[in-house]
């Protein structure tokens, strides 16, 4: 999917052939977008490809819509991603391992194994609740997202640029039977966009903060530390020493 062309159908090989010439043009376009905080309308269009998941192929819910976007737009999004990472490193807690340099799912699995091992050593009960958000990327409310970014200290200029990207965005769905008419998208972040995991992680972090988990006593208390959740993107593991403790939190 990374090499697939977007709605403009310009292949990545053309960018590779033009080399320095295309770099100069893209640099100029990206600078202009940043300056005026507006995007070319073609860059706000996405082609969605339904990728089948496990289950009944006749059910729409068993497909994951992945967005194909232009390679020129990907370059600009990559630059914005670098800017967002600076805020993510400051705002996201250690319990969140997604998009953290040098960390991944193995780290979270290792932590769970360590917690279980220590719980056995100190003869503690341990209960885990595994949560996976349904249609996570699709349910992000845009207006709430912009407010969250502002509350987290992300610059007004960057937030405005992101908001304008999602304003009046259009999409079409392409299948083996053809392509639909263009339609407006009013909510959600794109599957397949490099910015989407960043935006969703900040959105989910705000939700977790408002649960008050950081203020409750529920969790596993080992070697003086209290841990009540571990996260990797939208996969969240809650933990406590009893069912009652978790319900109370």
Question: What role is predicted for each listed range?
Answer:
Residues 135-152, 229-249:
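Catalytic palm subdomain of template-directed nucleic-acid polymerases
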Residues 83-96, 199-233:
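Active-site palm subdomain of RNA-directed nucleic acid polymerases
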Residues 71-72, 225, 241-242:
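Structured loop/turn residues at secondary-structure junctions
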Residues 1-203:
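Conserved pre-catalytic core of RNA-dependent polymerases
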């Amino acid at each position: 999917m990374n090499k697939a062309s977007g709605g403009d159908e310009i292949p990545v090989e053309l960018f590779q052939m033009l080399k320095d010439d295309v770099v100069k043009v893209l640099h100029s376009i990206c600078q202009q977008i940043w300056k005026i905080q507006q995007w070319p309308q073609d860059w706000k269009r996405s082609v969605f490809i339904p990728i089948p998941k496990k289950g009944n192929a006749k059910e729409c819910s068993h497909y994951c819509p992945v967005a194909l976007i232009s390679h020129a737009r990907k370059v600009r999004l990559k630059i914005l991603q670098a800017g967002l990472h600076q805020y993510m490193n400051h705002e996201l807690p250690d319990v969140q391992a997604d998009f953290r340099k040098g960390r991944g799912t193995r780290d979270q699995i290792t932590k769970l194994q360590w917690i279980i091992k220590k719980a056995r050593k100190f003869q503690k009960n341990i209960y885990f609740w595994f949560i996976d958000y349904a249609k996570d990327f699709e349910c992000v409310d845009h207006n709430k997202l912009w407010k969250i970014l502002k509350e987290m200290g992300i610059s007004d200029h960057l937030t405005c640029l992101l908001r304008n990207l999602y304003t009046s965005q259009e999409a079409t769905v392409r299948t083996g039977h053809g392509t639909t008419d263009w339609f407006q998208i009013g909510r959600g972040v794109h599957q397949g966009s490099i910015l989407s995991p960043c935006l969703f992680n900040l959105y989910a972090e705000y939700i977790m903060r408002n649960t008050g988990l950081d203020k409750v006593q529920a969790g596993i208390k080992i070697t003086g530390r209290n841990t009540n959740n571990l996260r990797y993107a939208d996969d969240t593991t809650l933990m406590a020493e009893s069912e009652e403790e978790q319900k109370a939190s």
